[in-house]
């Protein structure tokens, strides 16, 4: 077999403890199992096999969205620091848990290296307790990059580094960080340290990990206003139009139009507008000669690209659509809810999204069931040639009925009698090879993944209603 050699950034595992409905540690894994079905879309090298898709099913209030929120929390912690409303996000079914740290661990292929990053935080007070980063070698040996213990005021640069000056430099910054219990060291070491990375190339592993969280991980939920990679550009408009047309929207062409700044200022909160502009100005400081920093702001039925031109002037653009006639163009508000949702999701199908991880809650919101299935079929076919990873939550059982998913691409979230969310990969149930997953959900084999109705209470309500 010829092993793949391209540079990769892919998610391996994500673990969470004492966060929202997760009490004891729950591990979400993208590691491939023994299934032979659709093996072309499994990434493999000498040491690991990874799936590129994971669909998470579960009853209402089982905790599916809480897993997505856990991803979002970790990303926010790394990029922006503690998000608002964090103090009550521990597992509150057990009051004593407010005094127990919440823990998060993420395992990645980062430039083909197996990297593990983890931290623990006491959410009730917002105090970070521990943080560490290390590499796991092919022989399963740990090579520490750094270890930070804020309870004991300890910081140690690890044996990952070979250069003595690099170790001294990292320890210097690390020792300064042990008094700050609200910020992760990974965040601190990635603000205003460009010269340090130039002078100490070994430290770039810290920069690469930060970039993964900032640019290669996209977390989306139905209510979020997202700022991210501006994927609507003149270079890929045809690709987007062709995809939208193939998915049955009737759209045949797109064009980019400029929007007056005053109109946008009146549409979005001043705080958000200022944050987007501030982020662009920070990017502008280190941009190359030909690079114009840009960011996309998107919410329901509105897409805007903010960019600074060569003179650092702010330019805001949006997109318009034509159907059969290219002489008439419409804005997004004039399109259907389904088309707006497709535009929110189309990024996962673009070539520029290779090597990225998308975590999306309620992918089927506003989409016709057939559209959801067709879009997933298209993504899974493209996954044979790309290394984009897609993690979604869904209630759409037709995805199971269509039999387009491998068993190791399916995960269930159930809630036990204690109110704890439990992650159960489908492979845990050890279905027979000839057993169809859709049938197993309704014949009792997978009964614990379905909503738990109280038939006795329902009959009582009906009886009372008739009396």
Q: Could you say what each language-model-derived stretch is?
A:
Residues 120-276:
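Electropositive, glycine-dotted interaction segments
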Residues 9, 23, 99-101, 112-115, ...:
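Coil-to-beta-strand transition motifs
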Residues 1-79, 313-455, 461-467:
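Switch/communication elements of ASCE P-loop NTPase nucleotide-binding domains
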């Amino acid at each position: 077999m010829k092993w793949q050699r391209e540079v990769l950034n892919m998610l391996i595992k994500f673990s969470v403890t004492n966060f929202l409905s997760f009490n004891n540690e729950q591990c979400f894994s993208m590691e491939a199992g023994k299934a032979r079905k659709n093996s072309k879309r499994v990434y493999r090298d000498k040491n690991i096999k990874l799936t590129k898709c994971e669909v998470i099913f579960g009853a209402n209030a089982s905790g599916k969205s809480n897993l997505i929120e856990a991803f979002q929390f970790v990303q926010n912690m790394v990029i922006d620091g503690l998000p608002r409303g964090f103090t009550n996000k521990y597992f509150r079914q057990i009051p004593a848990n407010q005094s127990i740290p919440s823990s998060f661990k993420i395992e990645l292929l980062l430039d083909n290296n197996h990297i593990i990053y983890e931290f623990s935080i006491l959410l009730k007070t917002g105090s970070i307790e521990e943080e560490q980063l290390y590499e796991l070698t092919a022989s399963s040996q740990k090579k520490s990059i750094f270890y930070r213990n804020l309870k004991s005021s300890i910081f140690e640069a690890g044996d990952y580094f070979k250069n003595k000056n690099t170790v001294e430099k990292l320890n210097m910054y690390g020792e300064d960080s042990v008094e700050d219990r609200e910020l992760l060291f990974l965040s601190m070491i990635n603000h205003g340290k460009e010269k340090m990375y130039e002078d100490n190339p070994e430290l770039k592993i810290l920069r690469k990990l930060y970039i993964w969280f900032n640019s290669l991980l996209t977390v989306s939920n139905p209510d979020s206003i997202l700022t991210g990679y501006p994927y609507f550009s003149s270079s890929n408009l045809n690709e987007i139009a062709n995809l939208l047309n193939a998915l049955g929207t009737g759209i045949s062409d797109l064009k980019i139009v400029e929007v007056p700044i005053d109109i946008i200022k009146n549409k979005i909160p001043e705080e958000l507008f200022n944050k987007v502009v501030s982020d662009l100005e920070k990017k502008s400081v280190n941009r190359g000669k030909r690079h114009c920093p840009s960011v996309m702001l998107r919410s329901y039925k509105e897409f805007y690209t903010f960019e600074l031109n060569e003179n650092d002037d702010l330019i805001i653009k949006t997109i318009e659509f034509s159907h059969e006639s290219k002489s008439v163009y419409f804005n997004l508000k004039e399109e259907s809810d389904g088309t707006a949702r497709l535009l929110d999701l189309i990024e996962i199908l673009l070539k520029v999204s290779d090597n990225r991880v998308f975590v999306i809650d309620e992918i089927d919101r506003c989409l016709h069931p057939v559209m959801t299935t067709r879009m997933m079929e298209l993504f899974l076919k493209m996954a044979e040639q790309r290394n984009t990873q897609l993690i979604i939550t869904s209630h759409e059982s037709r995805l199971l009925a269509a039999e387009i998913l491998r068993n190791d691409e399916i995960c269930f979230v159930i809630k036990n009698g204690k109110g704890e969310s439990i992650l159960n990969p489908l492979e845990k149930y050890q279905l027979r090879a000839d057993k169809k997953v859709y049938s197993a959900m309704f014949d009792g084999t997978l009964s614990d993944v379905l909503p738990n109705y109280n038939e006795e209470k329902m009959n009582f309500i009906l009886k009372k209603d008739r009396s």
